[in-house]
Amino acid sequence: MRYPSLARLPRRALSGLARAPVRLQSQNFLSQRCASTAALRSASAVAPACQSALHRQFQQRRYASATASAVLEAAASSPDNLTQEAIIDNLDPVEAERLSRVRNIGIAAHIDSGKTTCTERVLFYTGRIKAIHEVRGGDKVGAKMDSMDLEREKGITIQSAATFCDWVKKDKEGKEHKYHINLIDTPGHIDFTIEVERALRVLDGAVMILCAVSGVQSQTMTVDRQMRRYNVPRISFINKMDRMGANPFKAIDQINTKLKIPAAAVQVPIGAEDEFEGVVDLLRMKAIYNVGPSGEELRETDEIPEKVKAVAEERRNMLIETLADVDDEIAELFLSETEPTEQQLRDAIRRATIGLKFTPVFMGSALANKSVQPMLDGVIDYLPNPSEVQNLALDKKRDEASVKLVPYNSLPLVGLAFKLEESNFGQLTYIRVYQGTLRKGANVFNARNDKKVKIPRIVRMHSNEMEEVSEIGAGEICAVFGVDCASGDTFTDGQLGYTMSSMFVPEPVISLSIKPKNNKDAAKFSKAMARFQREDPTFRVTFDAESEQTLISGMGELHLDIYIERMRREYNVDCETGPPQVAYRETIGNHVEFDHLLKKQSGGPGDYARVVGYMEPTEKLEENVFEEQIVGGSISEKFLFACEKGFHLACEKGPLIGHKVLGTKMLINDGATHMTDSSEMSFKNATQQAFRKAFMESNPSVLEPMMKTVVTAPAEFQGDVIALLNKRNATINDSDVGVDEVTVYADCSLNGMFGFSSHLRAATQGKGEYTMEFSHYEKATPQLQKELIAKYQKAQADRHKK
């Protein structure tokens, strides 16, 4: 490891180094500081009494700047050795105080678990809005975070919405502390999963909401996978405690068993269903009730109702036992049979939550205005501030080596554009600042194309409203106008060559042909398509040259329907759509060898290329592989690049039914060139021809997308639901029968699920619901393969007749 040189520090900062002791052990409870920055802290020499206050301030600024620079160097040269604790310890005290009061959180859950309702209460209790409005917009207003008319009509969240609020939390002495919360409310429907992906990519923590009746559902498991992908700590909130059949402890068991993350209640409910009154805080052993017209006031008492005393004691013991499994300090106390104090429990929950080892579980009812404020206290107590989260970037100047980002305002800027929106003032770009300061009027550089951009306006977003600010520091989220970029772009101030890995973007599974009904709307149609693609990476637009149709692709029928409806409302463009098209794939069958010669010589410059090798299935179905094993230079390197390009072009449109190719390997081990007639174009074309011929000789197959499907319906319709799935050749994997509802888990082909929603509603008297998520590709049935091949061959023949 290259240690930061003390020679880089100002001379005055070094003057007292010999006298000042070097602290190797951090006072912070987290862990030992790294050696590279321990010496930096010790260099703060005591200024002579004669120095002026102004001179002391200047010296402190110089020292802070040198310390930040040394930490930045350690973050780049030895990121593994620079601990997050060392970064925190060397923070400027003012910055440390600011960051300790910031929380960047998201709210995520299954459909209809109450995310937006809960967010509405958070905004009301923090004073961000003056009145509570409900989700479906029945009062002609609708929830604040559902700003689109479509969201209010359908009662679902389509786009993630960002806001900020201040929460005042009281400590044990009753002293008030103000915390700043950047909050993103996300959709629950699987079709809008990219909105959850990009929110979690930039957040430091999350609140996972579960229904007290349904517990862990299909989209809960998807959200859990997304949180794990981005290492996002979470607290859990069991909502709808006032619903019939509410059972929070069953939900906690499901978090432990289905999500496989240790979880324990930090509250127990006082009553349930219609008798739900409040909660008991298991750390302080106090009963908490909401009072006031909208539950805006809390009443705490030491008198725990007799009916819940035994449950509270039992669940407190379970909390301590669970913590003992994930935290060393509590484990020692547990083994010595010592009762941990409230503060020890609080610290242990925070350590384990930030360490992704545990999730504390809160409970309440957002709709009934009960127990939302204690959950907000949990956000402050147990979720990390920006300085406690490790964020990495890639240094393009050092072969994309990993570097640690340091949340100091004084360091060079690094920020990530994670979401784009079109507004009345132009493109709105949401940015998370990880390092440095983003200032109005500053020039920043897009790391993707090194393009310089000026920042004309910076705003904080409150759903569809905005508040202008002059600058944003490290650890904050904002939006900027007038920046032309793509979702996932990294911005720097030009001093660093850093880029951040972008979010995971799933492949579309369904397509539709689309065109405007009126040709006069073609310009507006093109403008809408371009905008929607910029905003949503899972929405794709392609033009099929053979059929001369524009195709839109997305994550499901609802996803595409929403964009068609938005085009009508926002651009006044009515569209005609064709039937849904499944994103089939083609794959090779057997190992097959090829020896293909392309030879066209007609007096002038001709074409000559010979490629020899074999094709076979890959080990992983999800990838295509091109390899070369040329010995003796029979094909030069520049022609081999052309061969590889030809291979990838051939994979874009397979010869069987015209869809993309998967799971195919091509290896070229010999060939021949001509002194004058060989060219890159010749070898590219020869490779494509060899590919098509060998592929068709290999007994290829058509693959169809299989969807992980979860159907929920009242228990009396279990037989009807299973019969409906069997009719569509679904593979039923599991079922959960609850008190009043049944959940069936199955794998179904996407092709067989078109129109399923209307059949499900008819079979369950409108009470059934289902979600689908892409699972994997599987060989289509022989009958379907024959139909698809015949249809493609007929279309090709008809096209050649024209």
Swiss-Prot record:
Transit peptide endpoints, chain numbering: 1-24
Annotated GO biological process: mitochondrial translational elongation
Occurrences of domain tr-type G (ranges): 100-387
Pathway: Protein biosynthesis; polypeptide chain elongation
UniProt main location, coarse: mitochondrion
Source taxon at top rank: Eukaryota
Gene3D superfamilies: 3.30.230.10, 3.30.70.240, Elongation Factor G (Translational Gtpase), domain 3, P-loop containing nucleotide triphosphate hydrolases, Translation factors
InterPro entries: EFG_II, EFG_III, EFG_III/V, EFG_IV, EFG_V-like, EFTu-like_2, G_TR_CS, P-loop_NTPase
Xref: SMART domains: EFG_C, EFG_IV
Location within or outside the cell: Mitochondrion
Annotated Gene Ontology cellular component terms: mitochondrion
Binding site for GTP: 109-116, 185-189, 239-242
Membrane-spanning ranges: none
The keyword Transit peptide is annotated on this UniProt entry: yes
GO molecular function: GTP binding; GTPase activity; translation elongation factor activity
Keyword field: Elongation factor, GTP-binding, Mitochondrion, Nucleotide-binding, Protein biosynthesis, Transit peptide
Keyword Secreted among UniProt keywords: no
Role noted for this protein: Mitochondrial GTPase that catalyzes the GTP-dependent ribosomal translocation step during translation elongation. During this step, the ribosome changes from the pre-translocational (PRE) to the post-translocational (POST) state as the newly formed A-site-bound peptidyl-tRNA and P-site-bound deacylated tRNA move to the P and E sites, respectively. Catalyzes the coordinated movement of the two tRNA molecules, the mRNA and conformational changes in the ribosome.
Family: Belongs to the TRAFAC class translation factor GTPase superfamily. Classic translation factor GTPase family. EF-G/EF-2 subfamily.
Descriptive protein name: Elongation factor G, mitochondrial
Organism: Aspergillus terreus (strain NIH 2624 / FGSC A1156)
